[in-house]
């Protein structure tokens, strides 16, 4: 499923995106963000992240750098912080 979604996004970038005016206000672009999110987090969570990004990309937002989150769960930050504190 993940590979199919990524191939669809690549097709969009190659065949459809060049026909449309440049409108994404973020770096990476929304389609690049979606491909990366799906590759890192899988089809379901990556698609949810991509949908959230698409909803944030509109004319009334400033945009800018908005990378795909690397964390796989809500608890990753707490675990790494605890481990970091234990080393100190």
Curated annotation (Swiss-Prot):
Membrane topology classification: Peripheral membrane protein
Subcellular location: Cell inner membrane
InterPro entries: Membr_insert_effic_factor_YidD
A GO term from the CC aspect: plasma membrane
Predominant cellular place of this UniProt entry's protein: membrane
Repressor recorded as keyword: no
Cell membrane in keyword set: yes
Record keywords, A-Z: Cell inner membrane, Cell membrane, Membrane
Domain of life: Bacteria
PANTHER family xref list: MEMBRANE PROTEIN INSERTION EFFICIENCY FACTOR-RELATED (PTHR33383:SF1)
Function: Could be involved in insertion of integral membrane proteins into the membrane.
Family, per entry: Belongs to the UPF0161 family.
Protein's name according to its UniProt entry: Putative membrane protein insertion efficiency factor
């Amino acid at each position: 499923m993940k590979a199919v979604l990524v191939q669809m996004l690549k097709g969009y970038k190659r065949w459809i995106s060049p026909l449309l005016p440049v409108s994404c206000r973020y770096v990476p672009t929304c389609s690049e963000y979606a491909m990366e999110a799906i590759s890192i987090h899988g089809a379901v969570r990556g698609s949810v992240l991509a949908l959230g990004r698409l909803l944030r990309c509109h004319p009334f937002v400033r945009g800018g750098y908005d990378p795909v989150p690397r964390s796989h769960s809500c608890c990753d930050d707490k675990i790494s912080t605890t481990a970091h504190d234990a080393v100190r």
